[in-house]
């Protein structure tokens, strides 16, 4: 397994949990957020596709988000998780996206988007395991600026 993928989903789930908790999400919404974070790249079906995602996420992240959402949408208990996944690459501060969705993007999608970006950035920034765990453990403090 590629080093860029190893434990990525777990780290994103942990970061998402801390942001969601600080944001004041209910227990149910927090649980859905953590599940969505753990599954957020399910639309990239192979490890090589996931590695490619890291390279192309900036240019066109939507195909895997839509595919992952569609995969889960038909399972009733995962309907809300599917909605979170569908929008997990939508930026909070993009007016054009806000107009298109008319404010219907779940806040969990924005939280997941930020957590995913932070993990990818910190993974490439911090080389030592000690720094990575410090960042994850303190993510709640670092991430509240935009919320």
Task: For the regions a language model picked out, list residue spans one by one.
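Histidine- and acidic-residue-rich, metal-dependent catalytic cores
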Residues: 1-147
């Amino acid at each position: 397994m590629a080093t860029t993928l190893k434990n990525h989903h777990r780290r994103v789930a942990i970061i998402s949990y801390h942001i969601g908790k600080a944001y004041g999400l209910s227990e149910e919404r927090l649980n859905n957020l953590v599940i969505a974070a753990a599954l957020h790249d399910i639309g990239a079906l192979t490890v090589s596709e996931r590695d490619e995602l890291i390279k192309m996420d900036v240019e066109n992240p939507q195909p895997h988000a839509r595919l992952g959402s569609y995969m889960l949408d038909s399972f009733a208990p995962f309907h809300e998780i599917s909605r979170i996944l569908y929008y997990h690459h939508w930026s909070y501060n993009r007016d054009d996206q806000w107009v298109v969705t008319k404010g219907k993007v779940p806040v969990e999608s924005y939280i997941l988007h930020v957590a995913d970006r932070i993990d990818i950035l910190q993974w490439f920034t911090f080389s030592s395991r000690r720094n990575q765990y410090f960042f994850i453990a303190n993510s709640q403090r670092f991430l509240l600026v935009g919320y």
